[in-house]
């Protein structure tokens, strides 16, 4: 049920907020042991919040836009008084003394916290297998990964363990799991949504966004969480449009660009390619014009990203040294050993790998050859997008080259794991808004994701095109049956 339909039923008194919360809790008790999408459950407080909303409605009070909607929150967003672990032993016992801006805005709008979701440790991964607390399973096939790093949020939405969720996206961590789990995942323009209270991975790339079962809900949630925040110096001080007012507008005459380099990729699965091109044809039937465009440096994004992101991570994660908070190694004789053993034992292998890569790239003898060169290539990638948007309104690609892969398939091959973000990374490097939504299923009944990319701050058009495609294609109405899917 969409947020709009839920709100209508709540306002008419056809259903209570407590009833919805109890439905979600019952669903969690039914399938969570199989999926492991949550790290922390907030059931009793959620019920108490729902009762307050029902009392306000009964008293005739005007309800906020997300009143009673149950949310799951990725466990790298700070929630005051509630554990926020980043799926790491390093922060296993960390309880933030403050609330992140995005969650604060959700609760003010009437949203209810159901729980905190699993992720790759410190959001570094593409499968949710690097979590210190165990992997999350894909609800379409529990032998496969849900994607990452926001795999817990994607799996929870797909399986009906919440109505919507928040995740973070540094190189595809919302869109890739959305693709693997058959849900909608939106990465806004860099700076459109505050990062205050998001535990940093790579500060020039991180962005918070929603997961939902439909584009309309994503638009409603973005409307609530977007907007200027003086506590985040990178947060843009620009008006936030009413996205929901525009998603039903016709896309006739819009120019959709198919990025040539994405469809020529050697590793692109043929079923994925076929589904995405069929989606492009559907958009054409709605009146859009299809234009092939070239972004020559698009596929250089992954090499660029894996210099810049680890470099920023090595700086951001330097604060975890056992001195002020977080895990601290015991039975050490001096400060130097305490720091070394704290980091060696507190961080998992993937986080350590990226810290080492970043430290190397920033070292005195290599900073010009690697980090500064990567920043130059990042500028060229951004210029490719700028040139493309002179001729088109929206860009279209697959979200990921493949559907969800088997658990453990890439654990000993980091490069193969990294390549699953090949098509999502460039939008992060350029700071562009992007969305993934289902566009079909492969022969194994696994969902395939369509990625749409818009120009800076053009989420309105992005959501409009995504919504029009979703309404016309009705992909999820013909989805294969699964007991773990909502």
UniProtKB/Swiss-Prot annotation:
Q: Where is the active site?
A: 74, 149, 173
Asked if the keyword NADP belongs to this entry, the reply reads: no
Enzyme Commission code: 6.3.5.7
Q: Which GO terms describe its biological process?
A: translation
Q: Which UniProt keywords apply?
A: ATP-binding, Ligase, Nucleotide-binding, Protein biosynthesis
- Identify one Pfam family in the record: Amidase
Matching InterPro entries, A to Z? Amidase, Amidase_CS, Amidase_dom, AS_sf, GatA
Broad enzyme group: ligase
* Membrane-spanning ranges: none
Q: How does it assemble?
A: Heterotrimer of A, B and C subunits.
Q: What is this protein called?
A: Glutamyl-tRNA(Gln) amidotransferase subunit A
Annotated organism of origin: Prochlorococcus marinus (strain SARG / CCMP1375 / SS120)
Gene for this chain: gatA
């Amino acid at each position: 049920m969409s947020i709009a339909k839920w709100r209508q039923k709540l306002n008419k008194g056809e259903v209570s907020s407590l009833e919805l919360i109890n439905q979600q809790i019952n669903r969690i008790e039914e399938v969570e042991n199989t999926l492991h999408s949550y790290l922390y459950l907030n059931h009793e407080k959620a019920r108490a919040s729902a009762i307050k909303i029902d009392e306000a409605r009964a008293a005739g009070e005007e309800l906020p836009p997300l009143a009673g909607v149950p949310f799951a929150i990725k466990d790298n967003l700070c929630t005051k008084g509630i554990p926020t672990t980043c799926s790491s032993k390093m922060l296993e016992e960390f309880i933030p003394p403050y609330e992140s801006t995005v969650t604060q805005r959700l609760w003010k709008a009437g949203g209810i916290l159901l729980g905190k979701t699993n992720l790759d440790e410190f959001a570094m991964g593409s499968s949710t297998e690097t979590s210190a607390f165990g992997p999350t399973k894909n609800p379409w096939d529990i032998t496969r990964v849900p994607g990452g790093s926001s795999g817990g949020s994607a799996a929870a939405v797909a399986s009906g363990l919440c109505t919507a969720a928040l995740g973070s996206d540094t190189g595809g961590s919302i869109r890739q799991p959305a693709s693997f789990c058959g849900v909608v995942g939106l990465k806004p323009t860099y700076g459109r949504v505050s990062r205050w209270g998001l535990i940093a991975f790579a500060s020039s790339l991180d962005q918070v966004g929603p997961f939902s079962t439909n584009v309309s809900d994503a638009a409603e949630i973005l409307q609530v969480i977007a907007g200027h925040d003086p506590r985040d110096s990178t947060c843009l001080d620009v008006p936030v449009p009413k996205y929901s007012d525009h998603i039903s507008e016709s896309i006739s005459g819009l120019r959709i660009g198919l990025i040539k380099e994405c469809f020529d990729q050697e590793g692109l699965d043929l079923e994925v390619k076929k589904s995405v091109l069929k989606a492009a044809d559907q958009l054409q039937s709605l009146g859009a014009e299809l234009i092939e465009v070239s972004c020559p440096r698009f596929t250089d994004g992954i090499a660029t990203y894996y210099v810049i992101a680890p470099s920023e991570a090595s700086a951001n994660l330097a604060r975890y040294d056992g001195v002020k908070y977080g895990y601290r190694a015991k039975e050490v004789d001096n400060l130097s050993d305490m720091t070394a053993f704290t980091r060696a034992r507190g961080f998992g292998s993937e986080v350590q790998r990226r810290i080492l890569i970043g430290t190397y790239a920033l070292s005195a003898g290599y900073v010009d050859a690697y980090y500064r060169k990567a920043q130059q290539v990042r500028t060229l990638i951004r210029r490719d997008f700028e040139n493309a948007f002179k001729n088109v309104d929206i860009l279209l690609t697959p979200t990921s080259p493949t559907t969800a892969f088997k658990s453990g398939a890439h654990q000993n091959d980091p490069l193969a794991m990294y390549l699953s973000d090949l098509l999502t990374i460039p939008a992060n490097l350029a700071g562009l808004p992007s969305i993934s939504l289902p566009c079909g299923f492969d022969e194994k009944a696994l969902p395939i994701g369509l990625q749409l990319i818009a120009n800076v701050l053009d989420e309105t058009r992005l959501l409009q095109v995504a919504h029009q495609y979703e309404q016309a294609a009705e992909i999820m109405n013909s989805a294969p049956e699964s007991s773990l899917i909502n």
